[in-house]
Amino acid sequence: IIIHEYGHGISNRSNPGGTGCLGNSEQAGEGWSDYLGLMLTQNWATALPGDGFNPPRGIGTYALNQPNNGPGIRPARYCTDFAVNNYTYSNIGAMAVPHGVGFVFCTALWEMTWELINDPSTTGIDPNIYNFAGTGGNVVALRLVMEGLRTQQCNPGFISARNAIMRADTTLYSGSHACAILRAF
């Protein structure tokens, strides 16, 4: 939860429009915050390329006195296994704003991370998530999300936030990860 809340500060202050620029019905603020929580608490030193579905990750488990692998506060745990988390963009119309919509956005970001880890355009997993010069899919994913935040339009929706990630890929990596990004979204 602490990293999640810190993530709100990052997303609100990284957006070019400032702190009042993330308020529409498709805003992904909760998603970026969940994503940062997942990325910064994942043990990348022991993670394997197939771990996107093992184990599924809940958010807020500690606050609910659940074990680390508990369901947490979202409609499903974050996981690339569609049998565990089958939420997609088509579900956002029925999701609560902002937490439900953000959950769906984070689901896509988590899927993108594991697509990049398993894509031949990266070197799999970098055990050091803070190595922004690294070519591991986890590092590439975090860099793309952060650059997308910094360059997206004011009041981005789900699609425009994704498009900002695509532009970040073009800027940072000459678009070499476009297919992996689109598979996730």
Predicted regions, residues:
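Extracellular protease catalytic domains of secreted zymogens
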Residues: 1-185
